[in-house]
Amino acid sequence: MRLETDEAFRRYADRVYASAFSITRDPTDADDATQDTFLRYHTRSDDFESEAHLKAWLLRVAINRAKDLSGSFWRRNTTALEDYMETLEFQAPEDSELFRAVMALPEKYRVAIHLHYYEGYGVDEIAALLGRRAGTVKSQLSRGRALLKNALQEEWNDDES
């Protein structure tokens, strides 16, 4: 199974970008990772077993590229999260609070939470994408949820004061 590059981009660019941004927390680096991902797709000659395999491959490449970019010495200067938040449209005010809290999590929790709740992947799929055990992913999701709960409770308690 193989899609034309522009069709693959149309279907998956938003998800690839969101996955990259969840790691880099920088719109420019997320754009770079997205472009690099689709460039690799365009130059790849192999077919995929299914559309799910294609999507998983794109996300895996984007995650790896985003990690490369975020670890680069030249990329340490990142755009403030607030600058990026202004470009997003949220359905409800609490959506932006939740997104901000997710982006503040340590990377290992942030990526697992993003893939599970924003991309809809199951534990086993996340484990395969990240090269981790399913038990590790479950722990990261549980700990990430606990950190989110605490962060959001603190924020809401501060708002009530």
Please describe what each predicted stretch is:
Residues A112-H116:
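A short pre-motif secondary-structure segment
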Residues D36-H53, F73-W74:
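Sigma70-family region 2
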Residues L3-T5, T78-E82, A92, A128-L129, ...:
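C-terminal edge and immediately downstream basic/flexible tail or linker adjoining helix-turn-helix-like DNA-binding
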Residues I63, K67, L130-E154:
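DNA-recognition helix of helix-turn-helix
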Residues E49, R60-L81, Q91, R143:
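Arg/Lys-rich amphipathic alpha helix in sigma70-family domain 2
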